[in-house]
């Protein structure tokens, strides 16, 4: 029986892993064994952090809205209660952008809620 060395597949597999680890630091980009482990760990972090990014952004929006409301004499919970009562359908992301970029529109919304 002939010996099968599997050379082309072997090289292609290593090349694929090393291509994905381009930009990593030290031997983690050039040593196949370390590159493979680092890449696997990086993919795990990427999967986990796609979930946490959503939580982080939501909390950032809440902090921004709260910060904008403190100078206007209303707190966050009263603000959102007023939004629901007036049936204003703006989400936290939009409100956060309004509070930063278009403060006059945000003040008008707060004025409507207060009165």
UniProtKB/Swiss-Prot annotation:
GO terms for cellular component: ribonucleoprotein complex; ribosome. Pfam families: Ribosomal_L20. One of its GO terms (biological process) is ribosomal large subunit assembly. Gene3D superfamilies: 6.10.160.10, Ribosomal protein L20. Keywords: Ribonucleoprotein, Ribosomal protein, RNA-binding, rRNA-binding. It comes from the Bacteria. GO terms for molecular function: rRNA binding; structural constituent of ribosome. Coiled coil: none annotated. Binds directly to 23S ribosomal RNA and is necessary for the in vitro assembly process of the 50S ribosomal subunit. It is not involved in the protein synthesizing functions of that subunit. Belongs to the bacterial ribosomal protein bL20 family. This is Large ribosomal subunit protein bL20. It comes from Borrelia duttonii (strain Ly). The lineage of its organism: Bacteria, Pseudomonadati, Spirochaetota, Spirochaetia, Spirochaetales.
